[in-house]
Regions:
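Membrane-water interface segments at the C-terminal ends of transmembrane alpha-helices
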Residues: 2-31, 42-156, 184-211, 238-255, ...
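A short amphipathic helical element positioned immediately N-terminal to and/or at the very start
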Residues: 32-40, 177-178, 311-317
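Short helix-to-coil transition segments within interhelical loops
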Residues: 158-185, 229, 317
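Solenoid-repeat scaffolds in large eukaryotic assemblies
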Residues: 166, 235-236
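Outer-membrane beta-barrel domain signature
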Residues: 167, 246-266
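Glycine-rich helix-loop "coupling/hinge" segments at transmembrane-helix boundaries
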Residues: 205-231
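Flexible interhelical linker loops that connect adjacent transmembrane helices
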Residues: 257-288
Length: 342
């Protein structure tokens, strides 16, 4: 009886996955010559190149910026404030992408916070924030906290005995960093990179809003344009399959090298990093944690500030907002229940 139930559930969810593909293939007409011409088109080449380029840069910058932040947090992970920061690092899963877009404009735009106080546009000879600069900033703000959480996860899996041995052998700070902590980060670096690369490669709202024109269009945006405006489902589906293939390729290679670790076990009350009490290390860690926390969580801070300062909360109590809120609540709760049961 148990196995019959399992097969029934598997069959049901298999249908849910396969039926959309049946609908997709019913819309496409395969013509090898047209497919060949489409992939030989210079516009298609530019779409593929820019999609890979912006995703690669975004993922690389997010990962490299996350490493010093994760290392600083790991050295003081027994503090309650660090646990709170680590919890906040998962906000990329719950914050709407459009809020990141608004935050980039409010903070880095022509009339934004940084330009108003530091006159960045004139000092750095910047004409506009829109384009590759805005896309990279938005992806960094969205994905660096996520990368920090994953790298912290890797560091958190280092056995306490390793630190005790390191301390007893009087290994230097850089020796400890290069021989113990960096290898643990390195073993999952490409996995984290591949996840963030896929997220940036599939990015839609950020590229659509901050791209600034067709020059900075990606495959995801082109699929939307072909399907909605040109009603050319052949091109949209071809690009979709190309996108799926590229993402699966990176994810397969990334997860092939994945090493397991303790994702939620942050509590190590007796944890004492061998070098955390050094005055210079304390100052550097403090500056890193404060700077990265302010910069990476600036979208949340910006949204809350404008929400309260402009009295937006007063306009939310209306029929339209409440209807949208309850629709979202019903969909999310129902989806959560179905996924949990399955």
């Amino acid at each position: 009886m148990y196995y019959k139930y399992n097969y029934s559930v598997l069959f049901f969810f298999g249908l849910i996955i396969l039926l959309p593909f049946v609908g997709i293939f019913s819309k496409i007409t395969f013509d090898l010559e047209n497919i060949y011409n489409f992939f030989q088109n210079s516009y298609t080449h530019r779409l593929i190149y820019f999609s890979l380029y912006q995703a690669f840069l975004s993922a690389l910058l997010s990962c490299f910026l996350a490493i010093p932040f994760a290392l600083a947090l790991n050295r003081h992970k027994n503090l309650k404030i660090i646990k709170f920061i680590i919890s906040l690092c998962g906000f990329c899963f719950v914050i709407p992408t459009i809020l990141i877009v608004f935050a980039v404009i409010k903070l880095f735009g022509n009339n934004g916070f940084y330009n108003s106080y530091f006159n960045l546009y004139e000092n750095l000879s910047i004409e506009t924030i829109f384009g590759i600069k805005a896309i990279l900033i938005a992806h960094i703000l969205l994905n660096t906290p996520f990368a920090t959480r994953l790298f912290f996860q890797s560091l958190n899996s280092i056995p306490l005995k390793y630190y005790e041995i390191s301390s007893s052998l009087n290994i230097t700070f850089f020796g400890n960093l290069l021989k113990l902590e960096i290898p643990y980060i390195r073993q999952n670096f490409f996995t984290v990179f591949s996840i963030i690369f896929s997220l940036c490669f599939l990015s839609f709202a950020i590229v659509m809003a901050l791209g600034g024109g067709p020059m900075y269009s990606t495959i995801e945006v082109a699929i939307y344009q072909y399907a909605l405006f040109e009603l050319n489902f052949n091109k949209a589906i071809l690009l979709s399959f190309l996108q799926i293939f590229i993402c699966l390729f990176f994810l397969f290679i990334g997860f092939y090298k994945l090493k397991g670790s303790n994702f939620f076990e942050i509590d190590q009350i007796n944890f004492i990093h061998p070098h955390k009490e050094y005055k210079a290390i304390k100052i550097i860690d403090f500056l890193i944690i404060v700077f990265f926390s302010i910069f990476l969580f600036s979208p949340i801070i910006s949204v809350i500030y404008h929400f309260i300062n402009n009295g937006i909360y007063l306009s939310l109590i209306n029929e339209k907002f409440l209807g949208s809120f309850f629709n979202s609540l019903i969909i999310s709760v129902t989806t959560g229940i179905i996924v949990s049961i399955s």
